[in-house]
Amino acid sequence: MRECISIHIGQAGIQVGNACWELYCLEHGIQADGQMPGDKTIGGGDDAFNTFFSETGAGKHVPRAVFVDLEPTVIDEVRTGTYRQLFHPEQLISGKEDAANNFARGHYTIGKEIVDLCLDRIRKLADNCTGLQGFLVFNAVGGGTGSGLGSLLLERLSVDYGKKSKLGFTVYPSPQVSTSVVEPYNSVLSTHSLLEHTDVAILLDNEAIYDICRRSLDIERPTYTNLNRLVSQVISSLTASLRFDGALNVDVNEFQTNLVPYPRIHFMLSSYAPVISAEKAYHEQLSVAEITNSAFEPSSMMAKCDPRHGKYMACCLMYRGDVVPKDVNAAVATIKTKRTIQFVDWCPTGFKCGINYQPPSVVPGGDLAKVQRAVCMISNSTSVVEVFSRIDHKFDLMYAKRAFVHWYVGEGMEEGEFSEAREDLAALEKDYEEVGAEFDEGEEGDDGDEY
């Protein structure tokens, strides 16, 4: 089996996690108590969905997931919510006091008390797997727990499970919508370790997803539930090929191989189509070509950056539902002819496609319409650098005056870590710049030391 363990850290990670597991259960026909009436092989454990669920002798399906937070309120919602019987109580780990939006608390003082317990639980889940493939890590880098404890856990996972791939789904601060003053600090400090310890990181940002909800679903005032349900569709599309048998299956390791040209250039944009409300879907016929085009629209991107300002290095298109390879090839051929979608000159093919015959499911009473086919795109584009340069700029404004730094130093951090992390990000911006640069500017001579 190719099991994946999901790790949900901090409020954002947990709430996105709730939306994801709700959707997985719907897709597989698993009830809120973990029973699965449609499963004929009780305790068999060789079904495709066993990559994400483990099956007990009593025929109950338990998610291979861990939820961690430094304060109890968000996890208590899971403990008392609809799916309280789905999770094993040991999988829900909560501390007593909050990281208070402080990376240093999440990473040093409070985080380190809880991290061994987390690794212990993860070890139990891993021992239960026959062929662990990797980890999906969900967190946000603006807060204290997601950034601090998130990085700490990733660092420790690298030590314990060096060869396993780690995919991060990371909520980055938005340009306009801010939830805390020290977001830029937390993000920069956290990205410093995301660079080292994740293989692929998919950037999400609330503002971009708000706009998609407003524009495409006509929700005037989107809530986090609306946002998370949209994000969960993306994550479900990515993992569908692990959970169902399909035509062109895409493995977690394949993402890495196809999307990451250089180890540091691993921050991805994602988009999903069709995002459409039930009222509209009734009147529209969404062909493969149409949904493919709309996945490439800048307004469909789930992070606030414009792919037209950069170049694509690689794209992964995951189709699900009523889609045949012939349609996909035609749609991709059309995309390649468009002048607005530019690829770097050293990567002429640039597309990896996957097809899964399981049509997309939607949460009953949710905002999305039930459609016959959908596509999720994960792309590696040099325009992602906009996300980093925005955060770096805000970081510089605050750090020049050393504002708020004493809170971090007081929790046992050194001021040098700030400048080290900031330099690492400056180097990352530079890397993106070089990757997007054309080769014909007389660079041939000095890239002999690259390889």
Curated annotation (Swiss-Prot):
Write down the Pfam families for this protein, in alphabetical order.
Tubulin, Tubulin_C
Where's the active site on this chain? Answer: 254
A GO biological process of this protein is: microtubule cytoskeleton organization
Q: Which residues bind Mg(2+)?
A: 71
Q: What chemistry does it catalyse, as a reaction equation?
A: GTP + H2O = GDP + phosphate + H(+)
Please provide, alphabetically and separated by semicolons, the GO molecular function terms listed in this UniProt record: GTP binding; hydrolase activity; metal ion binding; structural constituent of cytoskeleton
This protein's GO CC annotations: cytoplasm; microtubule
User: What is known about its subunit structure?
Assistant: Dimer of alpha and beta chains. A typical microtubule is a hollow water-filled tube with an outer diameter of 25 nm and an inner diameter of 15 nM. Alpha-beta heterodimers associate head-to-tail to form protofilaments running lengthwise along the microtubule wall with the beta-tubulin subunit facing the microtubule plus end conferring a structural polarity. Microtubules usually have 13 protofilaments but different protofilament numbers can be found in some organisms and specialized cells.
Q: What is this protein called?
A: Tubulin alpha-2 chain
Its gene is: TUBA2
